[in-house]
Amino acid sequence: MPIIEQVRAREILDSRGNPTVEVEVALIDGTFARAAVPSGASTGEHEAVELRDGGDRYGGKGVQKAVQAVLDEIGPAVIGLNADDQRLVDQALVDLDGTPDKSRLGGNAILGVSLAVAKAAADSAELPLFRYVGGPNAHILPVPMMNILNGGAHADTAVDIQEFMVAPIGAPSFVEALRWGAEVYHALKSVLKKEGLSTGLGDEGGFAPDVAGTTAALDLISRAIESAGLRPGADVALALDAAATEFFTDGTGYVFEGTTRTADQMTEFYAGLLGAYPLVSIEDPLSEDDWDGWAALTASIGDRVQIVGDDIFVTNPERLEEGIERGVANALLVKVNQIGTLTETLDAVTLAHHGGYRTMISHRSGETEDTMIADLAVAIGSGQIKTGAPARSERVAKYNQLLRIEEALGDAARYAGDLAFPRFACETK
């Protein structure tokens, strides 16, 4: 049996230069695995709590308390447990913390152990992680939702929408989808230069020009797709992450592109975009607690576009269940650090699929070289992954892992392509 023998932890840096937690787990059979925990810039209020140190060190963002929690409490609690019983291990972590938001020991400390245990168990079983988690039928390669133009909390510009993504839905394979996305990315750089706009990068590797607004950004990306010799809509679709909580103020409304708007007015704005651009997905179009607005928006345009819940659901089965009951969104963004254990993440995915919701696996803006989410995307058959631009090694690491998985699967590999969005046709395709 793959019994946990040793647990170690340390403080490392993420892609934004902020500290995060790395955990190592060793089993009695000699197997060893390591996991690093990501961190978000625009975080949902209802996410699992990251344990940070406060004080002057690293501007208060140190994670020595979380590391110590692993060494002093979490590690001793899981040593001796069977690593291939992930649910047992994760339940032990949840029980040990004893809070609904993992605020005592820290979601970052707990997640590091959860993921490292899963990796060690997979290695002990001599299985790739995607096969260990997903079983023998895991074979779907996801559409890469590439964030090639950054705004909002991911860039120091006046662009309110946080992410403008390209989705190579017409590619025949993941390797070709990655090539198409990379070529559009480079074409966008040329388009921006011709317009005299900045080609500096945001947190997730996308360009961060200070353009006039949403439609200006979408026009630039559409030009880049055509410049790369591809067809907007048929070959490469568009997607947005509005991260609307970031421009919502209680008592005021949505302060968006210089105008204060209601939820209904935001819905009208998005509806207008659908007729003009080949959009297949909009994430967080409204604020995280605007349940009524979300329900009305979903009823209005949910049959025309994928509506992804991130901050409103925070990968939490309880919040997702409420969303399903209220008709809120039609897809779930999956971020393992929002809920804090692999088991709870998989429970949320199962609930989403049973409720008829699509799932999109996602990175965070503060990433590491850890490639676990690439394996997770294939394991659950999500058909979609969001892990930044095809630039910066912490983003590219995930794409390269998916290339390896596609190669390992051989003839069994299937690229999701436009089947990842079966209910939504690009209106301008």
Curated annotation (Swiss-Prot):
GO terms for molecular function: magnesium ion binding; phosphopyruvate hydratase activity. CDD domains: enolase (cd03313). Mg(2+) A binds at D241, E283, D310. Enzyme activity and biofilm formation are inhibited by NaF. The covalent binding to the substrate causes inactivation of the enzyme, and possibly serves as a signal for the export of the protein. One of its GO terms (biological process) is glycolytic process. It is found in: Cytoplasm; Secreted; Cell surface. Phosphoenolpyruvate binds at S42, Q162, K335, R364, S365, K386. The modification N6-acetyllysine is found at K102. PROSITE patterns: ENOLASE. The modification Phosphoserine is found at S198. Keywords: Acetylation, Cytoplasm, Glycolysis, Lyase, Magnesium, Metal-binding, Methylation, Phosphoprotein, Secreted. The active site is at E204 (proton donor), K335 (proton acceptor). Changing K429A: Reduced binding of host plasminogen, dissociation constant increases about 2-fold to 882 nM. The modified residues annotated below were detected in protein expressed in M.tuberculosis H37Ra; different modifications are seen when the protein is expressed in E.coli, which are not annotated in this entry. It comes from the Bacteria. The modification Aspartate methyl ester is found at D72, D90, D123, D203, D210, D370, D375. GO terms for cellular component: cell surface; extracellular region; peptidoglycan-based cell wall; phosphopyruvate hydratase complex; plasma membrane. Its cofactor is Mg(2+). The modification Phosphothreonine is found at T199, T341. The modification Glutamate methyl ester (Glu) is found at E45, E47, E50, E73, E126, E195, E204, E367, E369, E406, E407. Optimum pH is 7.5 (expression in M.tuberculosis H37Ra). Disruption phenotype: Essential. Disruption confers a growth defect. HAMAP family: Enolase (MF_00318). Belongs to the enolase family. Homotetramer (expression in M.tuberculosis H37Ra). Homodimer and homooctomer (expression in M.smegmatis); homooctomers were active while homodimers were not. This is Enolase. It comes from Mycobacterium tuberculosis (strain ATCC 25618 / H37Rv).
